[in-house]
């Protein structure tokens, strides 16, 4: 049976790619006799989305989005409850750190008692709350300045919730519209403003390559250069980089920079 340790070693070699090969013969095998895990890993709540959403995953996108706004709890039709996520991570998977997704408690960001219960459950399991993945709160790079401001401010409550849960970050999207350079400027503006608020609350703002130009490593690294803030960074998903139309050498370089 494939052990978690061996799986992680193989994953590290694949994900590290150029970096691992560049070590000139160094390998991960030296860690095989250690009782310490090669990496400390966390479980993203989205990994269990089918078990939490259940049949609501079969709804059309418009109906699903309307329910998320009008009655988000009605979407939670699965056999795993959001409040049990930390318990499932620890008891079923042996993982002691979690990454929440805001759509599983979309109307609870300002509910102090609910957030306290989440933290109490996680603490009871010895599980660390790391971050909240934030979606469906507007485009941080919206070309319309008023809409962009609303999107930035919509994320404030998740910064506050992350702080109450003991997280270190929120994960956001660098969504925008327009030409390449213009989107970069707009996304950097929204991220900079949100990062200012996050910094006041000791919460980092990290961006996932999550569709659109954010899946272009060169573009996203350019956005990070524009923001230029120690509390704003990236959360690379190596399955989300689009490689179809760039030179391999160039794209490999930008992925390493973005990561």
List each language-model region with its residue ranges:
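Positively charged, amphipathic and often flexible ligand-engagement surfaces
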Residues: 240
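Glycine-rich, phosphate-binding/catalytic loops in enzymes
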Residues: 25, 59-60, 222-224, 251-253
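Basic- and aromatic-lined ligand-binding clefts that recognize polyanionic substrates
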Residues: 198-231, 243-246
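Active-site groove signature of glycoside hydrolases
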Residues: 162-182, 201, 206-214
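Noncatalytic carbohydrate-binding groove/subsite architecture in carbohydrate-active enzymes
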Residues: 247-253, 257
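Short glycine/serine/threonine-biased micro-segments
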Residues: 15, 209, 237
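N-terminal pre-domain/capping segments
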Residues: 2-164, 182-185, 192, 199, ...
């Amino acid at each position: 049976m494939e052990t978690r340790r061996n799986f992680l070693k193989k994953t590290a070699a694949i994900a590290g790619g150029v970096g691992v090969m560049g070590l000139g013969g160094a390998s991960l095998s030296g860690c095989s006799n250690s009782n310490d895990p090669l990496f400390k890993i966390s479980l993203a709540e989205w990994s269990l989305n089918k078990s939490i959403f259940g049949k609501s995953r079969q709804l059309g996108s418009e109906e699903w989005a309307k329910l998320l706004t009008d009655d988000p709890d009605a979407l939670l039709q699965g056999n795993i409850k959001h409040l049990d996520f930390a318990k499932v991570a620890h008891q079923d998977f042996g993982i002691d750190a979690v990454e929440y997704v805001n759509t599983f408690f979309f109307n609870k960001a300002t509910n102090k008692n609910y957030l306290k219960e989440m933290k109490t459950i996680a603490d009871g399991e010895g599980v660390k709350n790391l971050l909240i993945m934030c979606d469906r709160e507007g485009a941080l790079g919206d070309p319309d300045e008023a809409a962009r401001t609303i999107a930035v401010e919509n994320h404030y409550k998740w910064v506050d919730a992350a702080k109450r849960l003991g997280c270190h970050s929120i994960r956001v999207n660098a969504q925008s519209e327009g030409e390449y350079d213009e989107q970069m400027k707009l996304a950097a503006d929204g991220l900079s403003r949100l990062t200012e608020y996050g910094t006041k609350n000791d919460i980092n703002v990290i961006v996932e390559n999550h569709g659109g130009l954010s899946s272009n490593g060169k573009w996203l690294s350019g956005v990070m250069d524009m923001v230029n803030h120690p509390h704003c960074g990236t959360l690379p998903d190596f399955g989300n980089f689009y490689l179809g139309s760039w030179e391999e050498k160039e794209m490999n370089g930008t992925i390493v920079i973005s990561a």
